[in-house]
Amino acid sequence: MAVEEGQVLPGHALPFVGDCRWLISLDYDDTLRSDDAEQPVSDSFYELMRSWRAYGVRWGINTGRTLPYLCSELLPTAPFLPDFICTCERYVYIAQEDGKVSPLVEHNQRCYEHNMCVRESVTPLLHAQLLLLRQRMPELQWIIAPDDPLSVEAENSQTMDAIMAFLAPFVSSLEGVAPQRAGRYMRLADSRYCKGSALRSVAEQWRVPSSHWAIIGDGHNDLRAFQLFPEAFCGAPSTAHPDVLAWLADNGGCISSTPGVMEILYTWKPLHMTES
């Protein structure tokens, strides 16, 4: 079943009783997601989330992917839905009392309208800069995303490093606009919306303070969330971008010795979680 941005998701989150005490926000690509195409999220992760219900834990995926792109891979093998999903670093979907995961309609519409204004005003300016980039650094391999004129897809993360360095003076001159970067992908967006602000919108629904959040991710869009909420438990897999690893090392965050999220989650539990 195809899923479109803005719809109620098919399926249900696990039943939840009592107050939400803890929130776990997980990046998807290169963090929660494994390389196993047949089982992109491990059974052991789902079983852990099931067992942590007793601690008042809700969990979700906070990604730069669109909802259709995420769900096309996640839903066929997921035994239950996340309690929340944040897509494109801004749109929010949250589990209701019946377990259905539904969009925060007013929030999402506001995000859409604000970002359409950015698209209208910034697209010609960005494309002029990208033309200069093509002329001055023709060896770099990249494209403008076919479905978003403010998104750039590079050959690899190192190429995106070079692109971001070239665009930095231009981006810093834009009022109310910020880059959202994940590895080899980057989009310009309204600076009011990012993974951190999306997670805050989720937490407000369940009244969970940021000191009771765990934020796990590997990219610059996750780093921005770490910087906005350093009081949260922040962690990254061993494969995270060097900028992310450096910030965590300097600020007492958790760096896994392996790819994935399980080691980080097992580190977080004894430090913070107790049964009510």
Q: What are these regions, as identified by a protein language model?
A:
Residues M1-Y28, D36, S44-S51:
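Non-catalytic pre-domain segments flanking phosphatase-related domains
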Residues D35-D36, L70-S72, Q96-E97, A225, ...:
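Short glycine-/acidic-enriched loop or helix-start segments at secondary-structure transitions
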Residues V41-L140:
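Active-site phosphate-binding/coordination module
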Residues L74, M164-F170, P242-G252:
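Short, aromatic/basic amphipathic alpha-helical patches
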Residues H127-L228:
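Conserved acidic, metal-coordinating active-site core of Asp-based
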